[in-house]
């Protein structure tokens, strides 16, 4: 499993200051994707224990508000390693986790391992990027089919809880 970039002070992908990692590898290959180089699973650097520890240390910084997981595709990675990472974030960093995926929330719920990972994620931007639905006014996402989901509220209620008012 590889990552393309790790940022300690990211202000682009969510409000505030975020520790962000972009994982390598995506099978969706959405036309118009902003991060095509991350489609290649071999691109970037090995996500080993040293890289994981560095990312965790970024999150422990008092100026960092949350942890962001992007790609590539987070859920095309070694799911055991992703689960270990989100568990460590919740135990050691104790900050919200935001993730982006080309899967829909419903698709993730169909897979037991992906569903377990969701129990540690606070906010999910779901859905494949669709170039024809691209909207530069949207916050946190690129096309209007993508949703910003309150994962914990959705899991508790059994209904998808959308976070509204996300226009620039």
Model-based region annotation:
Residues 1-22, 27, 35-41, 160-161, ...:
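N-terminal [4Fe-4S]-dependent radical SAM core
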Residues 60-69, 91-96, 125-131, 155-168:
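Conserved C-terminal portion of the radical SAM core fold
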Residues 77-86, 134-168:
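P-loop/Walker A phosphate-binding loop and immediately adjacent motor/lid segment at beta-alpha junctions
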Residues 30:
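Short cysteine-rich clusters marking metal-coordination/redox-active sites
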Residues 122:
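Receiver (REC) domain switch/active-site residues of two-component response regulators
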Residues 2-4, 35-99, 103-112, 117:
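Conserved Radical SAM active-site core
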Residues 12, 106, 133, 157:
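Flexible, glycine-rich phosphate/dinucleotide-binding loops
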């Amino acid at each position: 499993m590889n990552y393309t970039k790790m940022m300690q002070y990211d202000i682009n992908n969510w409000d505030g200051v975020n520790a962000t990692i972009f994982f390598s590898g995506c099978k969706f290959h959405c036309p118009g994707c902003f991060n095509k180089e991350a489609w290649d699973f071999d691109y970037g650097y090995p996500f080993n224990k040293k890289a994981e520890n560095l990312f965790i240390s970024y999150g422990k910084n008092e100026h960092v508000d949350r942890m962001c997981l992007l790609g590539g595709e987070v859920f095309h990675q070694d799911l055991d390693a992703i689960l270990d990472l989100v568990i460590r974030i919740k135990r050691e960093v104790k900050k919200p986790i935001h993730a982006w995926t080309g899967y829909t929330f419903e698709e993730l719920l169909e897979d037991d391992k992906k569903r377990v990972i969701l129990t540690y994620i606070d906010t999910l931007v779901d859905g494949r990027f669709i170039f024809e639905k691209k909207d530069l006014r949207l916050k946190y996402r690129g096309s209007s089919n993508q949703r910003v989901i309150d994962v914990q509220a959705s899991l508790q209620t059994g209904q998808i809880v959308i976070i509204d008012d996300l226009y620039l």
